[in-house]
Amino acid sequence: MTRYALAVDVGGTKMEAALVAEDGRLLPGSRSRQPTGRDATFESLDAAVVTIVEHALAALPADAELVGAGIGSAGPVDRSLGAIMPVNMPLARGFVLEEAVRAAASTVLGGDVRTVLGHDGGALALAESWLGATQGAGASLSIVVSTGVGGGFVANGAYIPGATGNAGHLGQVRREGGLTLEEIASGPASAAWAQEQGWTGATGEDLARDAAAGDPLARAAIERSAREVGEALADAATLVDLDVVAIGGGFSRVSADYIDLVQQALTASAAHEYSRRTRVVRSGLGDEGPLIGAAALVLR
């Protein structure tokens, strides 16, 4: 009998769900998404949860076992309440996401479904350590650079959630000028900065296109993001002595050399040899990483 986890990933642009087998593979046909966004409310999130959970569980084979539901969400999260406090969805702060997923899954299956909520960066870190780019590392950090910036730590194969489940939330570290890293380096923040300089595009996708075509403002925005991420990672590497950092998320693919730019900034900024040796690599799991990580919360 194949064992599956229901995986749910909630971010500032979309939420997704899929069934993930105990070997980390997504079940074909089980994956779907619904929009979230800055205007997301308790009601809109609850409706989206029901839609994606029903779609995923409709694909569950009759002879399979569902071991539980794992959720990775934009944070901070409050694991004691099963609630989320997402910076990039202000109207959704306090939404009890864990119960929403449990209720939706239990309604479909006719019985209680064990459900675990985690921070999305921590879930990704667990996935990368299990099946991705940080396998075998003694100490690793995995981050997402997308609508937001999040991260999570793994040491010797064990996810380190911290006291409240929010360890690794790199995007909320304040940088020069009082802004958080997320407010400087995320996709939307980078596009907004470029617009302030006179660029006429609107999105991270526009930045990628225009930079590839030689637009200096678009390129400057990408370099600014990578530099800020690299400098923040230098601080993290100095603090916790990292072997490797894996970077995923849509904006990390804004240019072919984004990871190289981050590595250069980390190496230039780190104060000591042990932190300068930290390697920066691209996520080994692509856009499936957050879902695999959410599943790992109940499979691992």
Task: Give the label of every model feature segment.
Residues 36-64, 189-246, 251-261, 275-290:
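Adenine-nucleotide phosphate-binding core of ATP-dependent small-molecule kinases
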Residues 20, 116-129, 257, 261-300:
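Glycine-rich phosphate-binding/hydrolytic loop that grips phosphoryl groups
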Residues 13-14, 121-123, 147-150:
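Conserved A3 ("GATE") glycine/threonine-rich loop of ANL adenylate-forming enzymes
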Residues 9, 17, 71, 190, ...:
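Residue-level signal for inorganic ion chemistry
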Residues 2-73:
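Conserved phosphate-binding loops in N-terminal lobes of ATP-dependent enzymes
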Residues 42, 46-50, 65-69, 76-139, ...:
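Glycine-rich phosphate-binding loop and adjoining helix at the ATP-binding site
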Residues 2, 6, 18-22, 29-32, ...:
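Glycine/GP-enriched mid-protein hinge/lid loop-to-helix segment characteristic of carbohydrate kinases
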Residues 73, 145-147, 244, 249-250:
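Short secondary-structure boundary segments
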